[in-house]
A protein has these predicted regions:
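Class II aminoacyl-tRNA synthetase-like tRNA-binding/catalytic domains
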Residues: 1-110, 118-122
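Generic recognition of stable, solvent-exposed alpha-helical segments in well-folded globular domains
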Residues: 11-15, 19, 128-135, 139, ...
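A generic secondary-structure signal for well-formed alpha-helical elements
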Residues: 24-31, 140-151, 308
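A glycine-rich phosphate-binding loop feature that marks nucleotide/adenosyl-phosphate handling sites
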Residues: 37-41, 156-162, 201, 321
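Short, Φ-rich (hydrophobic/aromatic) sequence segments
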Residues: 81-86, 137, 299-300, 304-305
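Extended, charged alpha-beta segments that form solvent-exposed binding/catalytic grooves
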Residues: 95-188
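A translation/RNA-centric and nucleic-acid-associated enzymatic feature enriched
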Residues: 98-100, 172-334
C-alpha cells in the first residue's frame, strides 16, 4: 500500500467519523464530552456486556495498588455523568469511547480494540415506551443515511441502504424462523430488508432462550410494551454485501429504572450487585432516566467504505495467520 493510498484511506475514515458524529449530535441534541478509558475496579461502573468477558485489570501505584480496569463500554458511566452534568430532559452526551475487550474473537468484523460513539440521552418517565425507542432509532438511522449520501458525494461509493428502517421483535423473528439459530435469523431478516432493528434482546423467548445475552443492569429487556412483547432495547443490523452477511452497527436501548433493575438482577441471580456504587445510586432514584447506546465507529466505516476487514479502518493487533491471509487477498491492514 503506497503512502498516497494510506493517506487516502485515513482521509476517508475521517470523513465518515466527522460526518456521522456531527450529525448524531444534531439529531439527538447531544454534547460531545470527554470520557475515561479506565475506571476503578469494584464500583460496578464498567460494563459486563454479556456477563462473562474479562476486563483488562491492573494495580495502580498511587491508589495503593488498588486496581483499575479498562472499560468494556461506558453505559453505566454515562448515566452517572448525566447526573453530574444536571442535563435537562432531552439533552444528552456523546463520547468518543476507546475500549479493550481481550475475550473478543478475531474475525473480519471483530477486534479487541473497540471504538464507539457512546451516547446517552436524559428522558422523562413518559418516554419509557416502545414508540419513543423507535423514534430515536429512526433518527440514528437517518443520520446513517445522510452519512452514506455524503460518502457518495465525496468518494463516489453508491448508496445501498433502504430509505426506510424495518422493526421486528426477537420473538416475532423466532416465530418466523423457528428452525434457525439467532445469528441465522439475523442474516435472513437483514438480507430481506436491508436494514432492521431487532427489539427485545436479553430476555428469554418462547423457546426458553434469549435472542442474545445482555447484562442485567443497563438495558431494559423485561418491561412489557404496547405491542405485547417485552423489552425496550435492541440491535441495529444492516445487510453487508461485502461479506454477504448481516452486520450489527449498534446496540442500544431505554435503560433500566429501579424496578426493572431489581427484576433483571433477580432473573440474572446477581442481587449481590445492589451494593455497588452504580446500582445503589439507581435504586435510590439518584440517577436520571435515560436512553443510550453504542455505535461502532470502525464497523460503520468499514460498511460505508465497503471494506472486507475491520483492520482496514482501525489499527489493532491480529494473529499472524490473519495478517498473512489479508496480504494474500490484497487487504491492507492499518
Amino acid at each position: 500500500m503506497s503512502k498516497k493510498e494510506i493517506l487516502q484511506a485515513e482521509k476517508s475514515i475521517a470523513l465518515v467519523k466527522e460526518q456521522f458524529s456531527k450529525g448524531l449530535c444534531n439529531a439527538l441534541n447531544l454534547y460531545p464530552i470527554s470520557s475515561p478509558m479506565i475506571v476503578n475496579e469494584g464500583t460496578g461502573i464498567n460494563d459486563d456486556l454479556n456477563g462473562i468477558e474479562r476486563p483488562v485489570s491492573f494495580p495502580v501505584k498511587f491508589l495503593n495498588n488498588n486496581r483499575g480496569v479498562v472499560v468494556h463500554s461506558l453505559a453505566k458511566w454515562k448515566r452517572i455523568r448525566l447526573q453530574e452534568l444536571e442535563l435537562d430532559a432531552h439533552e444528552g452526551i456523546l463520547t468518543d469511547m476507546k475500549a479493550l475487550r481481550p475475550d473478543e474473537d478475531s474475525s473480519p468484523i471483530h477486534s479487541i480494540y473497540v471504538d464507539q460513539w457512546d451516547w446517552e440521552l436524559h428522558i422523562d418517565k413518559s418516554d419509557r415506551t416502545l414508540s419513543y425507542l423507535k423514534n430515536i432509532v429512526r433518527k440514528i438511522y437517518q443520520n446513517l443515511l445522510d452519512t452514506e449520501q455524503k460518502v457518495y458525494e465525496e468518494l463516489g461509493i453508491e448508496p445501498i441502504l433502504p430509505k426506510k428502517l424495518s422493526f421486528i421483535h426477537s420473538e416475532q423473528l423466532l416465530q418466523l424462523y423457528p428452525t434457525l439459530t439467532p445469528k441465522e435469523r439475523e442474516h435472513t431478516i437483514a438480507k430481506d430488508y436491508g436494514a432492521v432493528f431487532i427489539i427485545g434482546i436479553g430476555g428469554k423467548l418462547s423457546n426458553g432462550e434469549p435472542h442474545d445475552s445482555r447484562s442485567a443492569d443497563y438495558d431494559d429487556w423485561t418491561t412489557p410494551t404496547e405491542e405485547g412483547y417485552k423489552g425496550l432495547n435492541g440491535d441495529l443490523l444492516v445487510w453487508n454485501p461485502v461479506h454477504d452477511k448481516a452486520l450489527e452497527l449498534s446496540s442500544m436501548g431505554i435503560r433500566v429504572d429501579k424496578e426493572a433493575l431489581e427484576h433483571q438482577l433477580t432473573l440474572a441471580g446477581a442481587l449481590d450487585k445492589k451494593s455497588l456504587l452504580y446500582h445503589s445510586l439507581l435504586l435510590a432514584d439518584k440517577l436520571p432516566l435515560c436512553i443510550g447506546g453504542g455505535l461502532g465507529q470502525s464497523r460503520i466505516c468499514m460498511f460505508l467504505l465497503r471494506k472486507k476487514h475491520i483492520g482496514e479502518v482501525q489499527a489493532s493487533i491480529w494473529p499472524e495467520e490473519v495478517r498473512k491471509q489479508a496480504e494474500l487477498e490484497g487487504i491492507n491492514l492499518l
